[in-house]
């Protein structure tokens, strides 16, 4: 490119040099060709004003406006015609003859384009004029107020009906107001305003019913009868109305016509009563006829009902039937009330010859009882998610019209149309051999419980659009899939069929064919025996499983037979040239001939999700159940807290009572341990006994027994005392060991332990064994328990010994404690270490005790078995300590108890540290 540019610059420079050289030699430039001076143009066409006038007139434009519009259009076209002629004549002088035809065509095009634009603007004048006139009329109507909408008439004869309804419900629902408006012939707004005004004028509490409540029909009939009695004197004819209250000569026979009375008087005296009774019947029949003639209104219906109940005499059966036929125009019934069951008379047995023969089983009628549609929410949710794992954007259910699908062939007509018609209807089918995608779980619409006040159970977000749902799968046979398509709804144009001999090879179509053949193999796996399946098909099936069709889905396919679930996940087909309903029998051939076009949309297209309301309902039920469980758990925790608070208050009250009685005060650690032991004992007791079979304990014994020192060493003492071991304390809790200062009885003198005091302090079990000699258990290394891990490391060490009573107690008191190691081992009395209140910790050496066990010291290798090499833990009196073990491999050295020394915390009464402890040549560092 750079070389070409340099070459062009050189050529331009050479041309300029040649031109300057020619001018210097006296050469003259070539003159320009002179244009045509006498160019004549054809006249431009004039606009058709007559046709424009007819079109404006037909559009409804007034003559004056039409004339002005056409005039303006004609003037504009004339000005534009003269302008174009002048401009093109000036331009034609500089145009060569060979380009003249281009100039003429350009002149005609410029003129016609502008004229056509003005013509379109003129044709828009009628619409603009109509819009402007409508706006002006609206403005005039709004400002002058000359037009008033006729006010709807209020039918006052239906006021008693509204008042009767107001007596039961002052706040009707929209469905009730609409029903009342239809019955009374008024607008819903009128009914709403009437109830608003009536509520404003009413006094006292107003009745309000829920939409699902029932109207008490007995009370309704009673109120209707009372209203009829009140309105009866007003609506009766003049000769049947009762006399005024001020008239003294008023009599029941006053309203009877004179001719009827004279006829009655002419009878014999014995028949006076019979004649009067007949005359009264006739008068009442006339009143009933009058009321029946006016029964088109509510008051007429009320009067008719009141007149029918007026006669006291018994009517015949014909009269009763006629009275039943007089139905009311406005009738309020309880829609939820079940029909009254008639008493069934037992049929008498017929002779054997008269019993009809039941040939085809018609006598055994199926039960018409509807089963409950309630399902387990978890099962519903699991089944719906298994059938449709991916949420569908088409979350509404539709029902296909009867005439929208017509099958072309008879073999698949019934099966396919039955599947299509089941969309959006009924409950989920229990038949697992059918396709779950063709059944809907949406229940039918429920009927209203009172005046159609209930709304439909599901709200559909949008109507069904066939263009957004291009395809529906349905399994016609095991190896045949039918595709319901609509070419016009997809936006495909009609395509002409290719020749039969023409073959099209495409990589996408071949891949699609192979995938469909794989699906066919998958369907054929369960339809044919495994022995007949070829090795190629088995390999294809294994590859399908590796591609994502898992064993669970194959098992589901085995249950629901060969449906289109896997095919829908794999490929999607659209048939542009196919009729509305087509069955693709040979899919590979159809793909090769392009009878079926593969569609690869941006998102997977599926049919409308029949299970969407099903899944939503199941999720809603699951959430509701979770909320209930959470609420129940919260209530349970609240009850536990309340019970714990009551128990603590009861325990505090008991402690105050013991303190007033002079009993020793317990420390918080003892209180915690006693509560833990009581909780454990309660838990163990509930499994052995029921609450009703428990015997009440003595309050003093139970309160004192809960305060005794818990046992950590002796199993026999736990059995004798009847108390269970307390729970193991955590790292941040103190050990349940009781110091001697907790047993101060209020005096400085020694207290002699008597059986009564022993029973108060430690329970009746220990008091009963007070006089018995104590068995010397003897201290042995068995109280120190060692355990090793799998790799030979020291797992843990548990010291099952009891803390001594450290304090100012006498030897006699120590001898009575069955858990005291001093008296049980028959050792010399060790002087108790006095704890100074100012010192935090003190150290006690147990060297005087350990030589007693020198002869019974076990071998280290027997205790551990292998060389310790890892980090372990040691548990001493409920406390856990981490130890790093390491050293030589000499494990034959005996365990020397003389090197064990413990450090005690005086305030917490627990072990806090070990000193250097060589265990078999292994140093123990804490």
UniProtKB/Swiss-Prot annotation:
Residue ranges the record marks as coiled coil: none
Localization (cell): Nucleus
Stretch list, region Disordered: 238-281, 308-374, 424-452, 625-734
Biased amino acid composition, Polar residues: 428-441
Keywords: DNA-binding, Homeobox, Nucleus, Transcription, Transcription regulation
Single annotated GO MF: DNA-binding transcription factor activity, RNA polymerase II-specific
SMART domains reported in the protein's UniProt record: HOX
DNA-binding region in chain numbering: 147-206
Chief localization: nucleus
Biased composition (Low complexity): 669-687, 699-724
Domain of life: Eukaryota
Biased composition annotated in UniProt, kind: Basic and acidic residues: 267-281, 326-338, 632-660
Gene Ontology CC annotations of this record: nucleus
Alphabetical GO biological process terms: sexual reproduction
Keyword Nucleus: yes
Function: Specifies A-alpha-3 mating-type. May regulate the expression of genes specific to the homokaryotic cell type.
Protein name, entry field: Mating-type protein A-alpha Y3
């Amino acid at each position: 490119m750079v070389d070409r540019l340099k070459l062009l610059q050189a050529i331009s420079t050479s041309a300029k040099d040649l031109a300057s050289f020619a001018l210097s030699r006296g050469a003259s430039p070539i003159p320009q060709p002179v244009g045509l001076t006498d160019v004549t143009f054809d006249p431009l066409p004039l606009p058709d004003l007559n046709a424009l006038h007819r079109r404006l007139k037909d559009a409804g434009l007034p003559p004056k406006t039409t004339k002005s519009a056409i005039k303006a259009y004609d003037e504009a076209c004339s000005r534009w015609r003269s302008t174009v002629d002048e401009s093109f004549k000036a331009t034609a002088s500089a145009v060569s003859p060979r380009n003249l035809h281009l100039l003429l065509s350009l002149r005609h095009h410029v003129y016609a384009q502008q004229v056509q634009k003005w013509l379109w603007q003129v044709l828009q004048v009628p619409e603009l004029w109509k819009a402007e006139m409508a706006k002006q009329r609206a403005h005039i109507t709004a400002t002058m107020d000359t037009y008033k909408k006729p006010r709807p008439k209020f039918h006052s004869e239906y006021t008693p009906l509204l008042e009767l309804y107001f007596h039961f419900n002052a706040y009707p629902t929209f469905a009730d107001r609409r029903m009342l408006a239809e019955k009374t012939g008024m607008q819903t707004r009128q009914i709403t305003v009437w109830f608003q005004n009536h509520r404003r004028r009413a006094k006292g509490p107003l009745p309000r019913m829920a939409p699902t409540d029932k109207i008490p029909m007995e009370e309704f009939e009673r109120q209707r009868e009372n209203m009829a009695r009140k309105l009866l004197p007003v609506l009766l004819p003049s000769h049947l109305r009762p006399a005024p209250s001020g008239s003294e000569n008023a009599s029941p026979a006053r309203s009877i016509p004179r001719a009827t009375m004279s006829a009655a008087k002419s009878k014999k005296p014995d028949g006076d009563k019979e004649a009067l009774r007949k005359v009264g019947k006739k008068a009442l029949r006339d009143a009933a006829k009058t009321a029946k003639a006016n029964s088109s209104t509510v008051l007429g219906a009320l009067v008719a009902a009141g007149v029918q109940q007026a006669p006291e005499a018994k009517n015949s059966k014909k009269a009763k039937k006629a009275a039943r036929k007089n139905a009311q125009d406005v009738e309020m019934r309880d829609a939820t009330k079940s029909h009254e069951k008639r008493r069934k008379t037992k049929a008498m047995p017929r002779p054997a010859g008269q019993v009809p023969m039941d040939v085809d089983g018609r006598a055994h009628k199926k039960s018409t009882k509807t089963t409950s549609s309630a399902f387990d929410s978890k099962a519903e949710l699991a089944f719906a998610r298994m059938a449709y794992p991916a949420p569908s954007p088409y979350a509404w259910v539709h029902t296909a019209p009867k005439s929208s699908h017509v099958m072309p062939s008879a073999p698949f007509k019934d099966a396919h149309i039955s599947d299509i018609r089941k969309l959006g209807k009924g409950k989920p089918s229990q038949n697992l051999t059918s396709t779950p995608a063709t059944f809907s779980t949406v229940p039918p619409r429920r009927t209203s419980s009172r005046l159609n006040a209930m709304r439909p159970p599901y709200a559909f977000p949008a109507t069904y659009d066939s263009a957004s749902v291009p395809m529906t799968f349905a399994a016609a046979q095991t190896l045949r899939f039918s595709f319901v398509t609509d070419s016009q709804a997809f936006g495909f144009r009609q395509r002409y069929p290719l020749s039969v001999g023409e073959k099209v090879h495409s990589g996408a179509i071949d891949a699609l064919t192979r995938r469909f053949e794989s699906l066919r193999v998958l369907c054929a796996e369960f339809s044919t025996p495994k022995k007949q399946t070829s090795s190629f098909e088995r390999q294809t099936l294994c590859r399908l499983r590796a591609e994502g069709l898992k064993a669970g889905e194959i098992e589901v396919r085995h249950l629901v037979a060969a449906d289109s679930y896997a095919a829908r996940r794999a490929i999607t087909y659209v048939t542009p040239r196919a009729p509305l309903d087509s069955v693709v029998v040979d899919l590979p051939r159809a793909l090769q001939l392009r009878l079926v076009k593969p569609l690869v949309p941006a998102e997977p297209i599926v049919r409308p999700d029949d299970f969407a309301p099903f899944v939503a309902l199941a999720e809603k039920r699951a959430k509701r159940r979770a909320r209930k469980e959470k609420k129940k758990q919260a209530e349970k925790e609240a009850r536990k807290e309340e019970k714990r608070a009551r128990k603590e208050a009861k325990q505090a009250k008991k402690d105050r009572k013991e303190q007033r009685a002079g009993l020793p005060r317990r420390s918080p650690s003892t209180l915690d341990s006693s509560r833990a032991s009581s909780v454990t004992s309660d838990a163990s007791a509930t499994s052995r006994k029921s609450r009703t079979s428990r015997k009440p304990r003595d309050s003093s014994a139970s309160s004192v027994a809960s305060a005794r020192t818990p046992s950590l060493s002796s199993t026999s003492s736990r059995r004798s005392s009847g108390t269970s071991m307390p729970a193991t304390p955590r790292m941040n809790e103190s050990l349940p060991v009781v110091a001697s200062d907790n047993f101060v009885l209020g005096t400085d003198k020694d207290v002699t332990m008597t059986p009564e005091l022993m029973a108060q302090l430690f329970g009746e079990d220990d008091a009963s064994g007070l006089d018995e000699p104590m068995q010397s258990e003897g201290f042995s290394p068995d109280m120190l328990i060692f355990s090793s891990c799998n790799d030979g490391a020291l797992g843990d060490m548990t010291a099952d010994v009891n803390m001594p009573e450290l304090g100012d107690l006498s030897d006699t008191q120590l001898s009575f404690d069955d858990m005291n190691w001093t008296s049980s081992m028959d050792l010399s009395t060790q002087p108790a270490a006095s704890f100074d209140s100012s010192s935090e910790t003190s150290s006690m050496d147990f060297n005087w005790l350990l030589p007693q066990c020198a002869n019974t010291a076990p071998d280290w290798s027997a205790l551990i078995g292998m060389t310790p090499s890892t980090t372990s833990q040691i548990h001493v009196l409920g406390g856990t300590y981490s130890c790093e073990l390491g050293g030589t491999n000499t494990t034959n050295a005996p365990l020397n108890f003389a090197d064990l020394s413990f450090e005690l915390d005086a305030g917490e009464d627990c072990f806090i540290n070990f000193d250097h402890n060589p265990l078999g040549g292994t140093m123990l560092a804490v």
